[in-house]
Swiss-Prot record:
Annotated signal sequence range: none
Superkingdom of origin organism: Bacteria
Active-site positions on this chain: C104, C197
CDD domains linked: MnmA_TRMU-like
Stated name of the protein: tRNA-specific 2-thiouridylase MnmA
One Gene Ontology term of the molecular function aspect: tRNA-uridine 2-sulfurtransferase activity
One GO cellular component, as annotated: cytoplasm
Catalytic activity: S-sulfanyl-L-cysteinyl-[protein] + uridine(34) in tRNA + AH2 + ATP = 2-thiouridine(34) in tRNA + L-cysteinyl-[protein] + A + AMP + diphosphate + H(+)
Role this protein plays: Catalyzes the 2-thiolation of uridine at the wobble position (U34) of tRNA, leading to the formation of s(2)U34.
Transmembrane residue ranges: none
Region (Interaction with tRNA): 147-149
Entry keyword Glycosyltransferase: no
Gene3D superfamilies per record: Adenine nucleotide alpha hydrolases-like domains (2.30.30.280), HUPs (3.40.50.620), Translation factors (2.40.30.10)
Length: 360
């Protein structure tokens, strides 16, 4: 591998620290950077859950010191607010369910950060994502399928992938932690973050309520058309949700009810039985295709419809600014705003073909 000048995005976690260390071991000229993203005061409390905390910044700096690389903090809060946080709120207000980690990769880590890195003379950005990027430029699943993050990287363009490095793709999380211990990194046993970084303590409903206010409306049963409850904000619900519906009466058939759809125009949440969640066709928009030339005809592949979701065989057609997937078996709980990522099965790791944002 040719040694290049790389910027290591260091979140303060074990993955990004080991990724930076591996880049140094590979002979690259590495500089570490921690992104200051969230300006929610609650994220700066000692012991606050999530990421973007003061502890994370300190952990990233300590890791850089142990590795022996220069370290800086870049303030990306304004860009992050506009492209990720405001987008998150607007999507929920529109009745969709966004994936902010995916949007952050698309707009911040591999756009704003990469653009600044290139302007400063860096050749690539290295991150601790669990995914593989081969010499052929194709993005593949990690060997550790339980930690695979290729889904949230599926939005990246060929140009962005061409300036990215993912050194952890051939390792399991257990191996990464063991290596961190061997390197003397204090984050070796630091727990993974599973929260949305800008939502303090994982309270998404409270976060949205502060910004969108109370907007009471009806909860309607799809089977009868009857109003079976009231809500204080349709933004608090997502397709497939069962808990927290607070219905006024049992369903006529006695079966559990799930959120089937959210209609912002009428401020209505529609609920129904589980089987009504099943869909066999998915429409999506703004496709990004990286696994070779964009197909002129429908192709057979596999698709993933949410992070850590099941993989489903499908026939996918890409036309203009749209993508259509005919699922070979019905899937429940497909939510607008999430990504559909297409994969080609491969013995060397399933290849990401492309992605798009689910519209319906």
């Amino acid at each position: 591998m040719v040694a290049v000048r790389v910027l290591a995005a260091m979140s303060g976690g074990v993955d990004s620290a080991v990724a930076a260390a591996r880049a140094v071991a590979a002979g690259h000229d590495v500089t570490g950077v921690h992104l200051a993203l969230a300006r929610n005061p609650q994220t700066y409390r000692t012991g606050a859950r999530g990421c973007c905390t003061l502890e994370d910044s300190r952990d990233a700096r300590r890791a850089a010191d142990v590795i022996g690389i220069p370290f800086y903090v870049w303030d990306m809060a304004e860009r992050f607010q506009a492209d990720v946080v405001d987008d998150f709120v607007a999507e929920y207000a529109a009745g969709r369910t966004p994936n902010p980690c995916l949007r952050c990769n698309e707009k911040i880590k591999f756009a704003a950060v990469l653009d600044r890195a290139v302007a400063l003379g860096f050749d690539a950005v290295v991150t601790g994502h669990h995914a593989r990027l081969g010499a052929d430029g194709l993005l593949r699943r990690s060997v550790d399928l339980a930690k695979d993050q290729s889904y949230v990287l599926g939005v990246l363009t060929r140009e962005q992938l061409g300036r990215s490095m993912f050194p952890l793709g051939d390792s399991t999380k257990t191996q990464v932690r063991a290596e961190a211990t061997g390197r003397g990194l204090t984050v070796a046993d630091k727990p993974d973050s599973h929260d949305i970084c800008f939502v303090a303590d994982g309270d998404t409903r409270g976060f949205l309520a502060e910004r969108l206010g109370a907007t009471p409306g009806d909860v309607v049963d799809s089977s009868t058309g009857a109003v079976v409850g009231r809500h204080t904000g349709a933004y608090a619900y997502t397709v497939g949700q069962r808990r927290g519906l607070h219905l006024d009466r049992p369903a006529p058939d006695g079966r559990p009810r799930y959120v089937l759809s959210i209609t912002p125009k009428t401020n209505t949440v529609t609920v129904g039985p589980a089987e009504a969640l099943a869909v066999s066709q998915v429409r999506a928009q703004r496709p990004v295709w990286t696994g070779g030339p964009r197909p002129a005809d429908p192709i057979e592949c596999e698709v993933q419809l949410r992070a850590h979701g099941d993989v489903v065989p499908a026939t996918v057609a890409v036309t203009g600014d749209g993508l259509r997937a005919e699922l070979h078996r019905p899937v429940r709980g497909v939510a607008a705003g999430q990504a559909i990522v297409a994969y080609r099965p491969d013995p060397g790791g399933d290849v990401v073909l492309g992605s798009a944002t689910i519209a319906a």
